[in-house]
Amino acid sequence: MMMTKQKNSLAERLNIGEEVRELKLGATFNPKNTSTAFHTIKYDFKPASVDTSRMASVDVGSNNQVTVTVPNSESSGVPHTVYKGNQREYAKECLMIYDKETGAITIEKLNHNIQVKKTRNEVANKSVQLPGQNASVNMGQGQLHSQGANGSVPGPISAPGHSTGTAPKMENSTMRISTKTKVSTGSRRNNIIDFKPRNSPMQQSSPSRAVPVHRSPQSAPAWDANNAQQTLPSIPLITDDDDFGLRAALHNSGHANTSGSSTGSATGQPDFGSTSSSSHMGKQRQAPPHGHGKRQQMQQRLSPPMAQQQQPSNYGRGYNGGHNHVQQQQQRNSPQQQRPPAYGHGNSMPMDLDSTREHELTSQSVAQAAAALEQQIGGALSASSSSSESDSSDSDSGSDSDDSTEDDRPTQGQQQDHQQQQQQQVYQNHNHQQQQIAQQHLNQLPNLGLGSISPAYGSNHQHQQQMAPHQQQQKQQSGIYASNGGFPNDLLQNDLQLSSNSSDDDDE
């Protein structure tokens, strides 16, 4: 029944009656046939604009490539449609041809089966789209050339015959390329700006040079150098604390050199390494000779006449004590004159303050020594007056003692002059040594900009040299007893008179 239905449908469709017809074999079944061939073409898409009144063309190329060109109607605006595909041979397929006029049916063999697809490189589309494509490609090339990037331009150029369907894709691809190149070139520009101070040889002529200059850490000290407060800590400062530290060091060295100062004062040469502490210790050592001489004088007045013959040796001890006292007073002044070179490395103000303090200490020590000697002189005068009253009853012995004292006065004056000359020589030698040591200190000082320090030192040294004779004059004015072991000339004469009287009594 299905066959009848199919036949009925086929007979109805072909308008063939139910009658039996003869089937003829075509020329394709003839082996000698070379001019007739039947092919089937299968299209994927057939536009409605195809003009069936005109002939189409089929072009078979190498490798079984087939190009089919179908003409289109003039109203479509496109002259023809091009199909391309491949072909393959048939083996068992046949074609039946029905002739409506004669009613004959002919069967033919099929040669090739061709399957084609519509291409998008039509001539009309090609002529219309090429200006736009070229413009877009040129724009893309211009952007790439201006921005310095390499784009894949040969892709759109290699397909110049595409249809309108690829135009948006090509434009989109061009836009993608341009946007990508913009992003990439933007990042490259930033990288060039960042790396230009390191690698670029034209970094001086680049207008973006100012940006890395502010970022560079090497330019930071240039900004900090304008601020004076930040550079001050790098300059070494010498303050009053440093002066006190030097003073403490000199004080410790004075304790260490106490023995040296005592030996120097005993030999008549001042010790310049000693300080005020050694001078105070020298005062303590000075006191026993005076006290010892005073006790011996009191014992001489109370002792028998034979024991009074040892009195000149006691006066010699007193002279030695006075000479040591003068040398120790000069030794007190020597640290003052040595101190300015030590303080020459610092500021000049502490040097002046120390000189005034030392001057005050020296004046106080001189005043104390003068008061102690005056007390000793007063005690000695009272003792001598009592002894002179007890011995004044003997006139003969007094006349003899006058002769003896008159004989002794010239010798005493010569001794005093000789002692004064020795003191002046010692003082001159002391000043000469001080000048030499000061000159050595000036020569040994490093060249640290001492132009501002040396005038202060010179003025202070000159002031001390002027003060030294003044102090020496005060010492001489404080009492004539300083050169004679701490006793005045009258007291010495009275004591010598008493000793001569006692010697006369022994002779009688």
Swiss-Prot record:
Which GO annotations describe the biological process of this protein? positive regulation of DNA-templated transcription; transcription elongation by RNA polymerase II
Can you list the GO cellular component terms from the UniProt entry?
A: nucleoplasm; super elongation complex
Compartments, as annotated in UniProt = Nucleus
Looking up Pfam families in the UniProt record yields:
EAF
> Per the record, where are the segments of Low complexity compositional bias?
251-268, 314-341, 412-444, 461-477, 489-502
Q: Which residues carry this modification: Phosphoserine?
A: 200
Cite the record's Polar residues compositional bias ranges.
Answer: 140-150, 161-190, 272-281, 296-313
The answer to whether keyword Transcription applies is yes
Q: Compositionally biased, Acidic residues: which spans?
A: 391-406
The similarity comment for this entry is: Belongs to the EAF family.
What does this gene product do?
A: Promotes transcriptional elongation by Su(Tpl)/ELL. Essential for development.
**Protein name per UniProt:** Ell-associated factor Eaf
- Source organism per entry reads Drosophila erecta (Fruit fly)
